[in-house]
């Protein structure tokens, strides 16, 4: 259908901010993006801690879509980060200054109508917001934190049977005066069927660069970076 609604204990990273070709990598920075997870309260509703939420999606065509969602602001139900309080995902608590998390995304997913011959792509822009109070780097508090992001996945080379080379790039930001990372970039390449006779194996090379907010670089290094090379073997 054109309209889709979800309500319940949800994982935001399953539907917002993900990448088609970044899923092969093990480092968590290639999953839920660090420009959101590191700059919100207790990482937000993402694997493996869901949150009570509501998501609406409108499919304008087979490829164009828009979606928005709102979630409980603290998946741990603990401002101090005690993960044991909601370790089973059944502790529901709203209020107490937790605020709420919201995400918004608009995009075109060419993989939805891939004809098996062309080079499809998936392009989207989005925003995230958390409403609670955050400590700023100057010692004061600020209401809320938010950021913007853009993501592109593109198949670059196709072989028969779904094999081929694809790439992704993802860039996101957050408010500089109250965030750990001011902006984060991750990108990579993924090749399915690189080796002869191994049509379902996937090889990948990925890179993440996370720029610390300028106000905290006196205490820590200016950035963090990840380089990962991986090879996933299909056994059966």
List where the protein language model places each region.
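Residues on the lipid-exposed face of transmembrane beta-strands in outer-membrane beta-barrel proteins
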Residues: 1, 7, 54-58, 104-108, ...
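Transmembrane beta-barrel strands of outer-membrane/channel proteins
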Residues: 5-9, 66-72, 123-129, 165-173, ...
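Surface-exposed coil loops of outer-membrane beta-barrel proteins
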Residues: 2-102
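Short loop/turn motifs that connect adjacent beta-strands in outer-membrane beta-barrel proteins
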Residues: 2, 17, 63, 111-122, ...
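Extracellular loop and loop/strand-boundary signature of outer-membrane beta-barrel proteins
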Residues: 39-42, 85-94, 137-139, 172-176, ...
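C-terminal hydrophobic structural anchor segments
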Residues: 179-236
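Residues that define the transmembrane beta-barrel architecture of outer-membrane proteins
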Residues: 48-52, 98-102, 144-148, 181-185, ...
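Surface-exposed beta-loop-beta
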Residues: 73-153, 159
């Amino acid at each position: 259908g054109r309209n889709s609604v979800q309500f319940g204990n949800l994982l935001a990273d399953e539907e917002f901010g993900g990448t088609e070709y970044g899923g092969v990598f093990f480092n968590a920075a290639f999953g839920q993006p660090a420009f959101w997870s590191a700059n919100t309260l207790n990482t937000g509703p993402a694997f493996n801690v869901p949150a009570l939420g509501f998501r609406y999606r409108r499919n304008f065509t087979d490829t164009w879509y828009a979606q928005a969602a709102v979630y409980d602001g603290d998946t741990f139900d603990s401002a101090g980060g005690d993960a044991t309080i909601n370790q089973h995902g059944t502790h529901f608590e709203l209020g107490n200054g937790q605020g709420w998390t919201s995400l918004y995304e608009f995009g075109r997913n060419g993989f939805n109508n891939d004809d098996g011959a062309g080079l499809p792509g998936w392009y989207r822009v989005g925003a995230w917001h958390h409403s609670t109070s955050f400590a700023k780097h100057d010692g004061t508090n600020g209401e809320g934190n938010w950021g913007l992001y853009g993501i592109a996945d593109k198949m670059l080379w196709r072989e028969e049977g779904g094999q081929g080379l694809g790439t992704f790039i993802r860039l996101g930001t957050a408010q500089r005066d109250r965030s750990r990372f001011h902006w984060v970039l991750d990108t990579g390449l993924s090749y399915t069927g690189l080796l002869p006779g191994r049509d379902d194996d996937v090889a990948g090379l990925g890179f993440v660069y996370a720029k610390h907010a300028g106000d905290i670089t006196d205490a820590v290094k200016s950035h963090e970076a990840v380089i990962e090379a991986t090879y996933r073997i299909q056994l059966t």
